[in-house]
Amino acid sequence: MIPLIPMFLKQSLFFSLALTGMTTLVLTVSLGVPVMKWLKRKNYRDYIHKEYCEKLEMLHKDKAEVPTGGGVLLFISLIASLLVWLPWGKFSTWFFIILLTCYAGLGWYDDRIKIKRKQGHGLKAKHKFMVQIAIAAFTLIALPYIYGSTEPLWTLKIPFMEGMLSLPFWLGKVFCLGLALVAIIGTSNAVNLTDGLDGLAAGTMSFAALGFIFVALRSSTIPIAQDVAYVLAALVGACIGFLWYNGFPAQLFMGDTGSLLLGGLLGSCAVMLRAECILVVIGGVFVAEAGSVILQVLSCRLRKKRLFLCSPLHHHYEYQGLPETKIVMRFWIFSFVCAGLGIAAVLWR
């Protein structure tokens, strides 16, 4: 173990969590300008391609020159912060590093294909899905080593229920594994869908990650809970720092590099805390965004007409004529409420 932080700074958990978030925030803001210049030199521009919602082509035409791939900024800041605040001698620290690298690598490759083709389509959905399954499977395989046993893997934290629900029988184990896969892959894709307006994904993720810090602090039965809290604190700082450049009007987009990274990390943290059911509450914005896309597809196939003017949900409101800033602010408020409900669900007695 290589201690990079004096022990007196770690005497108070809340203080050290706050410093972790501040470290990532400062790193993100400090590195933002050089990263943007580098992306511009590489010609990483966002190509607006909304073939099913023609009106959005016009609404987003001014965004065409904004550099994308800004998720690399989130990746660098998160990695640096975790290496500072987490002990190098623990398996879990390097697990988080590998996990971040996998999601950032997948998103970066997807962004590169989009830029090369100069359109809104990157990797084929089935290919991206297969890689996401592989990363999620890696997470589940690593969990027993992180926990030190398999027992926590067969438990679940249920909203508004004290303690943990144990499912040690074989059907319960299958359910736990399936739910974990859905949580990780679903959250990664849901945040990817949410990233469609300036500051939307970063802002809503800040509240969601903050909510899960409280979940981690209440998860005394989970061996890895404290390390997860540090990761989530770093995530909050990274998202707030990214808003410095991504807030309206955006100077930088996170691209799939950022959205797949943020979603995959949040989903993985929820699984590590055995809080997949709490994720549905705290991540209510992401559930609504992904749900709107699923319902839209089903409606088009079964009813031959759209349920929403355009999906995901934020584009529906944009299509109705609501200003982008108002939509983003209202989604932030909804995310704040969801985080509050999630915290209440954990504190309930």
UniProtKB/Swiss-Prot annotation:
- Gene Ontology cellular component annotations, sorted alphabetically: plasma membrane
Cofactors per UniProt? Mg(2+)
Write the Enzyme Commission number(s) for this entry: 2.7.8.13
GO MF, one annotated term: metal ion binding
Membrane spanning segments where?
13-33, 69-89, 91-111, 129-149, 165-185, 197-217, 228-248, 252-272, 278-298, 327-347
Give the GO terms filed under biological process for this record: cell division; cell wall organization; peptidoglycan biosynthetic process; regulation of cell shape
Read off the Pfam families from this record: Glycos_transf_4
The pathway noted for it is: Cell wall biogenesis; peptidoglycan biosynthesis
Listed under catalytic activity are:
UDP-N-acetyl-alpha-D-muramoyl-L-alanyl-gamma-D-glutamyl-meso-2,6-diaminopimeloyl-D-alanyl-D-alanine + di-trans,octa-cis-undecaprenyl phosphate = di-trans,octa-cis-undecaprenyl diphospho-N-acetyl-alpha-D-muramoyl-L-alanyl-D-glutamyl-meso-2,6-diaminopimeloyl-D-alanyl-D-alanine + UMP
Q: Which UniProt keywords apply?
A: Cell cycle, Cell division, Cell inner membrane, Cell membrane, Cell shape, Cell wall biogenesis/degradation, Magnesium, Membrane, Metal-binding, Peptidoglycan synthesis, Transferase, Transmembrane, Transmembrane helix
Principal location: membrane
Does the record bear Cell division in its keywords?
A: yes
Question: Could you confirm whether the keyword rRNA-binding appears in this record?
Answer: no
Matches recorded under InterPro entries: Glycosyl_transferase_4, PNAcMuramoyl-5peptid_Trfase, PNAcMuramoyl-5peptid_Trfase_CS
Q: How does it sit in the membrane?
A: Multi-pass membrane protein
Tell where it localizes: Cell inner membrane
Role this protein plays: Catalyzes the initial step of the lipid cycle reactions in the biosynthesis of the cell wall peptidoglycan: transfers peptidoglycan precursor phospho-MurNAc-pentapeptide from UDP-MurNAc-pentapeptide onto the lipid carrier undecaprenyl phosphate, yielding undecaprenyl-pyrophosphoryl-MurNAc-pentapeptide, known as lipid I.
Q: Which family does it belong to?
A: Belongs to the glycosyltransferase 4 family. MraY subfamily.
Query: What is the official name of this protein in its record?
Result: Phospho-N-acetylmuramoyl-pentapeptide-transferase
Q: Which organism is it from?
A: Chlamydia pneumoniae (Chlamydophila pneumoniae)
